[in-house]
Amino acid sequence: MSEKFVKYPHHLKYESQDLKHVKLGFTTREGGYSLYPESSFNMARYVDDNPENITKHQEMLADAIGFVRAQWVFPIQTHENRVMEISQSHRGTNIDTLTDDMYGIDGIYTYEPDTLLTMCYADCVPVYFYSEKHHYVGLAHAGWRGTYGQIVSEMLKQIDFDYNDLKIVIGPSTSTTYEINDDIKAKFETLPINVKDYIETRGENRHGIDLKRANALLLNHYGVPFDNIYITDYATSEDLSLFFSYRVEKGQTGRMLAFIGQK
């Protein structure tokens, strides 16, 4: 399958023939005003960066994708599996300054137009949900904790239409070089999918995990057809000229922004 994330200045845009009203994408580290290193495009206010830089980057992205900043929504992620429906009243939350509003939310969805769902990433898996037919978009943040917590299942529980009408995009995130230990592997063995399909033992207390595939397997287990799931080849830990990587850069790095909305 050919790569559907197409590179533009400062972001990757997902392009598919079935998209008419939905826009989704993922920012890169290229260009911008942040120092991760110099001239990078950090999108997170919670890292050591000048807040004015993030505002400039937001404005640049807003101009590129056609959603003004006042239409954006940004929850405070905590690597859990809480999901929240977004209404028009939530627009603008945590865009200019971070607050306690929407704290501990790692999955969001809406049926509202002109509302941009956003979250920050630097290795964790962005899982995009959309249905043009039902005017629905959603976004989940799935690191190993969110994947183990089955946040994709929590997202699906909120959907009251046929999963055949649902499309999933699994975006840029860490590659299979990401490793977990025996204790974490044991947690994944309790999930309703076969660990042999996404975990590879590489040595004593070392197991490579494919978090993208794990989320795809979970989605399929709960009823989403594999034909409706797209997985990008882009890997944050493999291209530090294009992406930030929390693990590779040992936490001293910026964040990319995943976004999805409908007009």
From Swiss-Prot:
CDD domains: YfiH (cd16833)
Coiled-coil zones: none
InterPro entries hit by this protein: Cu_polyphenol_OxRdtase, Cu_polyphenol_OxRdtase_sf, Cytotoxic_necrot_fac-like_cat
GO molecular function per UniProt: adenosine deaminase activity; copper ion binding; oxidoreductase activity; S-methyl-5-thioadenosine phosphorylase activity
Subunit relationships: Homodimer.
Keywords: Copper, Hydrolase, Metal-binding, Oxidoreductase, Transferase, Zinc
UniProt cofactor(s): Cu(2+); Zn(2+)
Stated name of the protein: Purine nucleoside phosphorylase SH1728
The keyword Hydrolase is assigned to this record: yes
Lineage, opening ranks: Bacteria, Bacillati, Bacillota, Bacilli, Bacillales
Free-text function comment from the UniProt entry: Purine nucleoside enzyme that catalyzes the phosphorolysis of adenosine and inosine nucleosides, yielding D-ribose 1-phosphate and the respective free bases, adenine and hypoxanthine. Also catalyzes the phosphorolysis of S-methyl-5'-thioadenosine into adenine and S-methyl-5-thio-alpha-D-ribose 1-phosphate. Also has adenosine deaminase activity.
Family in the record: Belongs to the purine nucleoside phosphorylase YfiH/LACC1 family.
Binding residue positions for Zn(2+): H79, C124, H141
Protein species of origin: Staphylococcus haemolyticus (strain JCSC1435)
Transferase in keyword set: yes
Catalysed reactions, semicolon-separated: adenosine + phosphate = alpha-D-ribose 1-phosphate + adenine; S-methyl-5'-thioadenosine + phosphate = 5-(methylsulfanyl)-alpha-D-ribose 1-phosphate + adenine; inosine + phosphate = alpha-D-ribose 1-phosphate + hypoxanthine; adenosine + H2O + H(+) = inosine + NH4(+)
SUPFAM superfamilies xref list: CNF1/YfiH-like putative cysteine hydrolases
EC numbers for this chain: 2.4.2.1, 3.5.4.4, 2.4.2.28
